[in-house]
Amino acid sequence: MSKPIQMERGVKYRDADKMALIPIKTVAVERQEILRKPSWMKIKLPADSTRIQGIKVAMRKNGLHSVCEEASCPNLAECFNHGTATFMILGAICTRRCPFCDVAHGRPVTPDANEPEKLAQTIADMGLRYVVVTSVDRDDLRDGGAQHFADCISAIRAKNPNIRIETLVPDFRGRMDRALEIINAAPPDVFNHNLENVPRLYRQVRPGADYHWSLKLLENFKVANPQLPTKSGLMVGLGETNAEIVDVMRDLCRHGVTMLTLGQYLQPSRHHLPVKRYVSPQEFDEMKQEALAMGFTHAACGPFVRSSYHADLQAKGIEVK
């Protein structure tokens, strides 16, 4: 499809259609050029998928979305089978068009005012004790969706008084002060915002985002809420070096971040950014030791680690790979 002159509201643009809208073009990779996955990247699917289907049905019934499905997470089967999911609020259409991400791009619809209550009830029905709430970027909203986050946090706590809530927020570009003012009034238990990759590759990997802005967002929340942990994550395998990853880790430490996730980037389709390298489990272990030596209190580093992968265990300091 050629580049649309005007995107239709509510239409999801994916793969080649989404990439056509990015200023820095990504050339589709031919099948023979795709790096072969090493043995440690093989996923064993669960024999029983009953619980997986149950969670999907609950999501559809309440009109909710999970980032697990929308972003094609490789851990979906494992997490759903254990009765956990990362809820994605504010719709399933992102105003950004990052070429590593499988979430659809487009003009999103008006946020569902009933979503906080539906989300809270679904979490109660699932009996969750720890929940991760994330969102698409909503550059079309004055507060970037911050009030919706706050409403969801309040609604979840009202129906689930003993729950712990982790939020994985967008960068609130151009509206950080207003967004944090709203979120600080009803803060989560863990505040997460991913840097995703190293600053040298930002223009290609995160078009529309700013490395230093993201660091400032994490720092400003920490200053306002010194008792609460802040968290960030990176993908490896996009062309960065291990030395650059270590430099980012140092930047995060300097900005008060205490929880870190590092995981292998996987290409969602041949139209997305290609995998440049597969990082070995041994290298991930070395990065973890480096992170802990720097002062991180929690560091989950491994090929299948994602920001919200076993987030409840990460928060307890239990090793996750």
Curated annotation (Swiss-Prot):
Q: Which UniProt keywords apply?
A: 4Fe-4S, Cytoplasm, Iron, Iron-sulfur, Metal-binding, S-adenosyl-L-methionine, Transferase
Q: Where does [4Fe-4S] cluster 1 bind?
A: 68, 73, 79, 308
Needs which cofactor?
[4Fe-4S] cluster
Q: Where does [4Fe-4S] cluster 2 bind?
A: 94, 98, 101
Gene Ontology molecular-function annotations: 4 iron, 4 sulfur cluster binding; lipoate synthase activity; metal ion binding
**Pathway in which this enzyme or protein is active:** Protein modification; protein lipoylation via endogenous pathway; protein N(6)-(lipoyl)lysine from octanoyl-[acyl-carrier-protein]: step 2/2
- Which parts of the sequence belong to the Radical SAM core domain? 80-297
Name the domain of life this protein comes from.
Answer: Bacteria
> Which Pfam families does the UniProt record give?
LIAS_N, Radical_SAM
Q: What class of enzyme is it?
A: transferase
Q: Where in the cell is it found?
A: Cytoplasm
Metal-binding among keywords = yes
- The protein's Enzyme Commission number: 2.8.1.8
Describe the family membership recorded for this protein in Swiss-Prot or TrEMBL: Belongs to the radical SAM superfamily. Lipoyl synthase family.
Q: What is this protein called?
A: Lipoyl synthase
What organism is listed for this UniProt entry?
Answer: Sodalis glossinidius (strain morsitans)
